[in-house]
Protein backbone atom coordinates (compact mmCIF):
# COMPACT_ATOMS: atom_id res chain seq x y z
CA UNK A 1 0.00 0.00 0.00
CA UNK A 2 1.42 3.40 -0.95
CA UNK A 3 1.34 6.47 1.26
CA UNK A 4 -0.88 9.16 -0.23
CA UNK A 5 0.33 12.73 0.14
CA UNK A 6 -0.44 15.88 -1.79
CA UNK A 7 2.96 15.50 -3.46
CA UNK A 8 2.01 11.96 -4.57
CA UNK A 9 -1.07 13.32 -6.33
CA UNK A 10 0.73 16.21 -8.03
CA UNK A 11 3.59 13.91 -9.11
CA UNK A 12 1.14 11.37 -10.54
CA UNK A 13 -0.58 14.08 -12.59
CA UNK A 14 2.69 15.62 -13.79
CA UNK A 15 3.95 12.19 -14.86
CA UNK A 16 0.80 11.66 -16.95
CA UNK A 17 1.24 15.10 -18.54
CA UNK A 18 4.92 14.43 -19.25
CA UNK A 19 4.02 11.15 -20.98
CA UNK A 20 1.59 12.93 -23.31
CA UNK A 21 3.49 16.22 -23.75
CA UNK A 22 7.20 15.34 -23.37
CA UNK A 23 8.38 18.56 -25.04
CA UNK A 24 6.56 20.87 -22.56
CA UNK A 25 7.96 22.02 -19.24
CA UNK A 26 5.87 21.22 -16.17
CA UNK A 27 6.10 23.35 -13.04
CA UNK A 28 4.81 22.27 -9.64
CA UNK A 29 4.72 25.76 -8.15
CA UNK A 30 3.31 29.13 -9.15
CA UNK A 31 6.59 30.64 -10.38
CA UNK A 32 5.79 32.93 -13.32
CA UNK A 33 9.10 34.74 -13.82
CA UNK A 34 11.32 33.24 -16.46
CA UNK A 35 8.88 30.58 -17.58
CA UNK A 36 9.43 29.03 -20.98
CA UNK A 37 6.31 28.55 -23.08
CA UNK A 38 4.61 26.23 -23.72
CA UNK A 39 4.39 24.91 -20.18
CA UNK A 40 2.04 23.53 -17.55
CA UNK A 41 1.59 24.47 -13.90
CA UNK A 42 0.10 21.82 -11.59
CA UNK A 43 -0.90 22.51 -8.00
CA UNK A 44 -3.55 21.78 -5.41
CA UNK A 45 -5.98 24.67 -4.87
CA UNK A 46 -7.57 23.19 -1.78
CA UNK A 47 -8.21 19.97 0.05
CA UNK A 48 -10.62 18.57 2.58
CA UNK A 49 -10.62 15.49 4.77
CA UNK A 50 -13.58 13.74 6.36
CA UNK A 51 -13.37 10.80 8.73
CA UNK A 52 -15.46 7.86 7.53
CA UNK A 53 -14.63 5.56 10.43
CA UNK A 54 -11.74 4.89 12.79
CA UNK A 55 -9.32 3.90 10.02
CA UNK A 56 -10.79 5.36 6.81
CA UNK A 57 -10.69 8.98 5.68
CA UNK A 58 -12.18 10.54 2.55
CA UNK A 59 -10.00 13.27 1.07
CA UNK A 60 -11.18 15.72 -1.58
CA UNK A 61 -8.66 17.66 -3.66
CA UNK A 62 -9.26 20.41 -6.19
CA UNK A 63 -6.37 20.41 -8.66
CA UNK A 64 -5.57 23.38 -10.89
CA UNK A 65 -3.66 22.88 -14.13
CA UNK A 66 -2.65 25.91 -16.18
CA UNK A 67 -1.34 25.78 -19.71
CA UNK A 68 0.69 28.81 -20.82
CA UNK A 69 1.55 29.07 -24.51
CA UNK A 70 1.59 31.30 -27.53
CA UNK A 71 -0.90 29.01 -29.29
CA UNK A 72 -4.05 30.12 -31.06
CA UNK A 73 -7.43 29.50 -29.44
CA UNK A 74 -8.16 26.40 -31.58
CA UNK A 75 -4.76 24.94 -30.59
CA UNK A 76 -5.47 25.65 -26.91
CA UNK A 77 -8.87 23.95 -27.25
CA UNK A 78 -7.13 20.91 -28.74
CA UNK A 79 -4.81 20.73 -25.72
CA UNK A 80 -7.86 21.07 -23.45
CA UNK A 81 -9.57 18.10 -25.11
CA UNK A 82 -6.42 16.00 -24.79
CA UNK A 83 -6.17 16.95 -21.10
CA UNK A 84 -9.79 15.92 -20.53
CA UNK A 85 -8.91 12.44 -21.79
CA UNK A 86 -5.71 12.20 -19.75
CA UNK A 87 -7.14 13.54 -16.48
CA UNK A 88 -10.31 11.42 -16.53
CA UNK A 89 -8.37 8.32 -15.48
CA UNK A 90 -4.78 8.38 -14.21
CA UNK A 91 -3.13 5.35 -12.68
CA UNK A 92 0.20 5.15 -10.85
CA UNK A 93 0.68 1.73 -9.31
CA UNK A 94 -2.04 1.36 -6.67
CA UNK A 95 -3.12 5.01 -6.96
CA UNK A 96 -6.03 5.62 -9.34
CA UNK A 97 -7.27 9.18 -9.89
CA UNK A 98 -10.74 9.72 -11.34
CA UNK A 99 -12.65 13.00 -11.08
CA UNK A 100 -15.72 12.99 -8.84
CA UNK A 101 -17.45 15.76 -10.79
CA UNK A 102 -17.12 17.11 -14.33
CA UNK A 103 -13.78 18.71 -15.16
CA UNK A 104 -14.17 22.45 -15.76
CA UNK A 105 -11.88 24.56 -17.88
CA UNK A 106 -11.69 28.10 -19.17
CA UNK A 107 -9.35 30.14 -21.34
CA UNK A 108 -8.58 33.64 -20.09
CA UNK A 109 -6.03 35.88 -21.81
CA UNK A 110 -4.68 32.89 -23.73
CA UNK A 111 -4.10 30.78 -20.60
CA UNK A 112 -5.96 27.49 -20.26
CA UNK A 113 -7.05 26.71 -16.70
CA UNK A 114 -8.51 23.34 -15.72
CA UNK A 115 -10.11 22.49 -12.39
CA UNK A 116 -10.20 18.80 -11.55
CA UNK A 117 -11.92 17.47 -8.39
CA UNK A 118 -10.53 14.17 -7.09
CA UNK A 119 -11.68 12.12 -4.10
CA UNK A 120 -9.44 9.56 -2.45
CA UNK A 121 -10.20 7.01 0.23
CA UNK A 122 -7.27 6.79 2.61
CA UNK A 123 -6.70 3.98 5.09
CA UNK A 124 -4.74 4.98 8.17
CA UNK A 125 -2.79 2.30 9.93
CA UNK A 126 -2.89 2.31 13.68
CA UNK A 127 0.37 3.44 15.17
CA UNK A 128 1.84 0.79 17.39
CA UNK A 129 1.25 1.75 20.96
CA UNK A 130 4.07 1.50 23.43
CA UNK A 131 3.07 -0.66 26.32
CA UNK A 132 4.60 -0.48 29.72
CA UNK A 133 7.10 -3.06 30.78
CA UNK A 134 6.36 -5.26 33.73
CA UNK A 135 6.86 -3.61 37.06
CA UNK A 136 8.07 -5.78 39.86
CA UNK A 137 7.37 -4.39 43.25
CA UNK A 138 8.51 -5.84 46.48
CA UNK A 139 6.89 -4.76 49.63
CA UNK A 140 6.25 -5.96 53.09
CA UNK A 141 3.21 -5.66 55.25
CA UNK A 142 3.75 -4.86 58.92
Predicted regions and their residues:
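Charged, amphipathic alpha-helical segments and their flanking helix caps
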Residues: 1-27, 47-142
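A short, hydrophobic beta-strand-centered structural micro-motif
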Residues: 37-45
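Short acidic low-complexity segments
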Residues: 27-35
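Short gly/pro-enriched beta-turn/loop segments at secondary-structure junctions
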Residues: 35-37, 60
